[in-house]
Design a protein with these regions (language model features):
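Short, surface-exposed basic-aromatic patches at helix termini and helix-loop junctions that form
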Residues: 108-117, 272, 360, 388-389
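Right-handed parallel beta-helix
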Residues: 120-121, 158-166, 252-262, 275-287, ...
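Short glycine/acidic-rich loop motifs that flank beta-strands on beta-rich extracellular proteins
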Residues: 93, 104-107, 127-128, 148, ...
């Protein structure tokens, strides 16, 4: 059987088809599809990282039409699509083809050795009938909980891919709550008139009474409903249990390439505890106002390539996570060995983000040549007391940003749970009379290197908001230009900050560097050993 090896991984010649005859008289050729990352990149990384392995698939394919699927936008094609996947899996692997057309479906479960391929003009629309998505035990926002099954899912699978040029629409508008202040008056009136309910404050619309009840029971509890709940209770709150659009858990050798994923009920792409992941030339399109509408949340994964993608998000764009609080520390799976290159992020709460769920640790992350446009924050590191976890060895370079309403770069260890644009003052440190001791619940951020960053338009250039008991440490910034900034660089509770060739142009005249409770700050070779609570203001 012919094997299709998808080595998809920037900078090498276009697709080449190379017959490999290896002494087997009856073996057909093996197809090697375009490399997309120069192998030399691995050897030039500032940390040691093994190459990301790619999935391989036998040269066998089926078309969902042959299983009874109909592209009329009316017929529910759940069984046909899953039957096709199951047959290809049973045959040892291959390709399931979704041709052009509008395909209505319920949840799709991807199995080992299956490449789900969408042709151009194929639109897969997930049903707005939420009863089709069973309530299952899973993980969301770093905690074990119950949610509805994702429209696309895989668990413990190996050699899986979603490729081609089609679109997967999660029908998220039927799931998500919507905040009034994110819509125009006309949009809000239209939404309320469509059905659903509005909370007691008149600020948030929910798709049903059950969704509102779920929100009330989950208040201040990380979206997890409290109390002794029966199956009937969970079912009533089904609309609150919004799934991520794509959930891959404990999978190995995963490829997402070429397809568009849009309108997710919650997060869009969520690989969890996976290894050898490639996400290349993917488009994510979520409304800018979509609640929890993250584009990509890479959680507790090892060896990943995130390259050549376009992410339009309602929340964080490219986000690195590793579990929350005690559960995340107990899981103990860091997110590590990740290359993020040549991506564009629009809207949302952050371009590249680490946290806030980082309790299992984050290390060995390389981010290069990315563009952020109109994101609330550009480079965003966030956590708070209780998380624990160690974030280190992050290397960021060649970042271009425009129209950043808040910080171009922020380290915030007082994260309050909202986007900076929703409440810029929520995370400001309050006066503390007692400094807590360092424990396993204390998050640590250190050894981070950022260079060659250009930003035009920012609310504030840089903000370090560290913890007094565990200062942000060894942060290195070089060749940073931020123009048209309302405020400059503000450093608080940091140690060993090295800044070289920093240029900050403020909209109004004034000092562009403010420091308080920092030590060992070096600016172009000049060291500031200790600056206390009285603070100091300078110009670069």
């Amino acid at each position: 059987m012919t094997t299709l090896i998808i080595k998809k991984i920037l900078l090498l010649p276009a697709t080449c088809l190379i017959p490999l005859l290896t002494g087997c008289n009856n073996c057909p050729s093996t197809t090697i599809v375009e490399d997309i990352i120069d192998p030399a990149i691995y050897t030039s990384l500032p940390f040691k990282m093994d190459k990301v392995e790619q999935p391989t698939f036998p040269d066998y394919s089926v078309n969902i039409i042959d299983f009874g699927a109909k592209p009329d936008g009316i017929t529910l094609n759940t069984k046909a699509i899953n039957d096709a996947i199951q047959q290809v899996n049973a045959k040892g692997g291959g390709k399931v083809i979704i041709p052009e057309g509008l395909w209505l479906t319920g949840p799709i479960e991807l199995l080992s050795n299956v490449n789900l391929y969408t042709e151009k003009n194929a639109l897969v629309l997930f049903s707005a009938d939420h009863s089709l998505y069973p309530i299952i035990n899973t993980s969301f926002e770093g905690l074990e909980t119950r949610r509805c099954q994702s429209p696309i899912s895989a668990r413990n699978a190996e050699n899986i891919a979603i490729t081609g040029h089609g679109v997967f629409d999660g029908n998220g508008d039927t799931w998500r709550p919507t905040k009034k202040d994110k819509l125009t008056e006309g949009q809000w009136k239209k939404l309320v008139a469509s059905g659903g309910v509005v909370d007691a404050d008149g600020r948030i619309w929910y798709p049903s009474e059950g969704a509102l009840k779920g929100a009330i029971l989950s208040k201040d509890n990380f979206n997890v409903p409290r109390g002794e709940l029966t199956d009937s209770d969970w079912d009533y709150m089904r609309d609150w249990l919004r799934p991520v659009l794509l959930s891959f858990i404990k999978c190995n050798k995963v490829l997402l390439e070429g397809a568009t994923f849009k309108n997710s009920p919650s997060w869009c792409l969520h690989p969890l505890s996976c290894e050898n992941i490639t996400i290349n030339k993917v488009t994510v399109s979520n409304p800018w106002y979509s609640q929890n509408g993250d584009a990509l949340d890479l959680e507790s994964c090892n060896k990943a390539l995130i390259i050549n993608n376009s992410f339009d998000a309602g929340d964080d764009g490219i986000c690195i996570k590793s579990g929350k609080d005690e559960q995340g520390r107990k899981r103990g799976e860091p997110c590590q060995n990740v290359i993020v290159m040549n991506n564009t992020v629009l809207h949302g709460h952050g371009g590249f983000v680490v946290g806030s769920e980082m309790s299992g640790g984050v290390n060995n992350i390389y981010v290069d040549n990315c563009t952020f446009m109109g994101t609330d924050v550009g480079l965003r590191f966030k956590s708070n007391r209780g998380r624990g976890g160690l974030v280190e060895n992050i290397y960021i370079s060649n970042i271009n940003m425009i129209n950043i309403p808040n910080e171009a770069l922020i380290f915030n260890l007082y994260y309050g749970g909202k986007g900076r644009g929703e409440d810029p003052n929520q995370d400001e440190k309050k006066a503390e009379t007692t400094i807590p001791p360092v424990t396993e619940e204390t998050p640590i951020f250190r050894n981070i290197f950022i260079k060659d960053v250009t930003c035009n338009g920012a609310g504030r250039a840089v903000f370090f908001n560290g913890l007094p008991e565990m200062r942000i440490k060894n942060i290195n910034m070089e060749n940073i230009i931020v123009s048209n900034a309302k405020e400059g660089v503000v450093l608080s509770e940091a140690d060993e900050v090295n800044m070289k060739n920093i240029k900050i142009e403020l909209v109004k005249s004034g000092k562009n560097l403010k420091m308080q409770n920092v030590s060992n700050v070096t600016i172009d070779g000049k060291n500031h050993a200790e600056i206390g609570a009285q603070g100091e203001e300078l110009n670069f």
